[in-house]
Amino acid sequence: MREREPSLVYAFRQSTPYVNVHRGATFVLMMGGEAICHPNFANIVSDIALLQTLGIRLVLVFGSRPQNDEALARAGIEAQYHRRIRVTDDESFAIIKQVCGGLQYDITAQLSMGLANTPMQEARISVVSGNFVTAQPLGVDDGIDFCHSGRVRRIDVEGITRQLDQKGLVLISPIGCSVTGESFNLSSEEVARRVAVDLKADKLICFSSTQGVMDRHGEAISELFPEQAEELLVELEQAGEEMSGTARYLRAAIASCRGGVPRSHLVSYQDDGAMLQELFSRDGLGTQIVRESAEQARAATIEDIGGILDLIRPLEEDGILVRRSREQLEMEIDKFTIIERDGLIIGCAALYCFMEEAMAEMACVAIHPEYRNSNRGDQLVAKVAERAKRLGIRRLFVLTTRSIHWFRERGFDPLEVEDLPVERQRLYNWQRRSKVLSKTIS
């Protein structure tokens, strides 16, 4: 007898909004040589095929740093670097071109698989490579001749777009051609960044050895603004990790974000399904560098009523919150502040002012179950207190039956019912017998 798979059903339902949002979007994938030689690369290829099936336009930029170093070492050539850039002489470049060419064919072969009973069955991905990147030499710096090391001069946006319009997957190597007929060794991070910015891509996705950028506790930081990411980059450089994959990809992500790419992501190439979880779940798995946060606290509007009801209904049924009808919410929606994350309301609170006494009640405080162990409650209290202060309120109070200690930990002190505004005293429910706590905010 076949068994139901509720986890599969749940995953499909949760990912549906993101499938709709991402369809037709352009993603640039940046994959270093470390990712390509990792055992999980076959799974990443399957995930790339899935993205293509879902109608996402893909450009894959690959690097070859470890493969280059290994091939040069076998040839007895010591790798030379200056200011984090490889110095590519004639002998080195001949080997690097062979390595990159081999990798390009290997990646194309992997993306072309169509074996039965595999995720690639019937994938039929059309992989397109070409002279999409025009390069120029780096020249001489500090007396060091970079020889065949170059930088990106121009991206053929029209050519790449034409291939994407025809549902091709564009594969770009770190070797670029110049207008003089020469070729140059490029930084794959620079290539990916320029492609993402010039294409006006929706996302740049970087595959790192770690699950994004880690904090001091070894946990992945879910979201960073460019300024915050820059501070972490300085810390990495001071720790001597300026050449690490995380540092290189972080530089590219920051520059892409500042160049107009809305979101750049750092995910692990070692963890199976990391990219899919990052793209198709609300909280992701890695780190995203964003121009604007996916989460915001704001005043509620009439369109938010359905989401607020979904959030507070379970708490009303448990007796934690007083029941509110849709009609009541519609009339009082201007009193609500919400926290929204990717279209989902994960927190709400209402502010009822009693101007004569310069007091206000914070009511209907609710946080989504998946976010109760975070600081969303503190954010909500701070936002409501800030709003009350702007209105001239000096004292904020709450009525609660279950969350007394939570509010006490945040500076709220016990208050007698008799100390409430007269109008609020008349509405006090003596059967419910809620505890009253207050906090000075002036």
From Swiss-Prot:
Gene3D superfamilies named among the record's database cross-references: 3.40.630.30, Acetylglutamate kinase-like
Enzyme class: transferase
InterPro entries assigned to the protein according to its UniProt record, in alphabetical order: AceGlu_kinase-like_sf, Acyl_CoA_acyltransferase, Asp/Glu/Uridylate_kinase, GNAT_dom, NAGS_kin, NH2A_AcTrfase
Residues annotated as domain N-acetyltransferase: 295-442
Keyword field contains ATP-binding: no
Domain of life: Bacteria
Pathway assigned to this chain's UniProt record: Amino-acid biosynthesis; L-arginine biosynthesis; N(2)-acetyl-L-ornithine from L-glutamate: step 1/4
A Pfam family matched in the record: Acetyltransf_1
Documented EC number(s): 2.3.1.1
The keyword DNA repair belongs to this UniProt entry's keyword annotation: no
Cellular compartment(s): Cytoplasm
Protein name according to UniProt: Amino-acid acetyltransferase
Species name: Aeromonas salmonicida (strain A449)
Lineage: Bacteria, Pseudomonadati, Pseudomonadota, Gammaproteobacteria, Aeromonadales
